[in-house]
Structure formats: C-alpha cells, structure tokens
Amino acid sequence: MLPLYVVNNHGQFNHLILRTLRDMDIEATMISNETPPAEVARGCRGIVLGGGPTLERAGVASAYLDLGLPVLGICLGLHIMATARGGAIRRGASGGFGAVEVEIFEQNPLLRGYPDRMQVWASHADEVSVVPEGFVRLAGSSICGVEAMASPDEHLYGIQWHPEVSHTVNGRLLFENFDGICSE
C-alpha cells in the first residue's frame, strides 16, 4: 500500500504529524512543499498539508489539491485549501493558542466518532473568513467561525486545530478516519 505524504509547510508540528501517523502504524513520509505534483501523484494515496507560518512559504502545495487524491489540510493547510478554491482568510479577531472547545455542526467521514463538542489545541493567528464554493462548514468555535470544512466530492478536508498535539482530545481518531478515507 502506498504511504500518506505529510507536506512540510515549515510548521512547528509537522514532524509530530509524521510521528503520530507512524506511531499508529500508518505508513507515512514527509515531503517538501516544493515536491513536483506529478511526483506526489505517483507516490502516495493521500496527502496531509501540515501547518506553517505563511501562505508565501507554502511552495506548490496548492497544486496537490488538483491531483484527485484525498487531502487533509491542518491549520495553514486549511488556509491553502480555502484560498486555492476561491475562499478567503483574514487575521483572526483573537487568534488562538491553547485549548479551544469546537462545536461540530455537521457530521462527515473525517469527524466520524466525535461528540458534538470537543476540546482541541489551537495555534494560529489567521482564520478562514469565506468558505469556498463546494465546501461545507463542519465545525466552529467561539474564537474561529470555521474550525473545519470539507468538499466531499473532491475528498478535501480542512481543520484549523492540531490533532497531532496531545492536548487535542482523541486527535488520533481524526487521523484514523482520514486513513480510512484514503483506503477507500
């Protein structure tokens, strides 16, 4: 079975994403966000766009959304997804660093098994302000209106929080669900 690719967007938790997947016995490989899309398309069964400081340092990661593979965008990965598909991001009113209670508005294969409210770990200053056409807002919080969104037809999923951090309650379930999506 092909691995999942974790795209390194220069974020502080990207190696923790890789470590979490490997600890779960999910084959995964870290790649640069400058890896040519054709190479990515041949080598994996799904993509995790990791976090990072700015869209300007996201390399060619937005091109990976057009490969027909399932994609999970985490933090900056969510912002890459939103802007590449016609949405918008802005500086958050308060930003988020620490524990946040997220409310799930709509269930989805990525969020299968989670309760309607859950504790997650946030580490961001920007947020999605306009959800792209074809996407559904799945979750929000008191500090961030779009905590999760998805384009079910394209198998594109984005979350603002960090499931790889131990402070996110049951964060591994999200990776388990994404692995299942990539195995369908």
Swiss-Prot record:
Keyword terms of this UniProt record: ATP-binding, Glutamine amidotransferase, GMP biosynthesis, Ligase, Nucleotide-binding, Purine biosynthesis
Reaction equation(s) it catalyzes: XMP + L-glutamine + ATP + H2O = GMP + L-glutamate + AMP + diphosphate + 2 H(+)
UniProt xrefs under CDD domains: GATase1_GMP_Synthase
EC annotation from Swiss-Prot or TrEMBL: 6.3.5.2
Keyword Ubl conjugation: no
Organism listed in the record: Methanoculleus marisnigri (strain ATCC 35101 / DSM 1498 / JR1)
Domain of life: Archaea
Domain Glutamine amidotransferase type-1: 3-184
GO cellular component terms given for this protein: cytosol
Active site: 75, 162, 164
One Pfam family named in its UniProt record: GATase
The name this protein goes by in its record: GMP synthase [glutamine-hydrolyzing] subunit A
InterPro entries listed in its UniProt record: Class_I_gatase-like, GATASE, GMP_synth_GATase, GMP_synthase_A
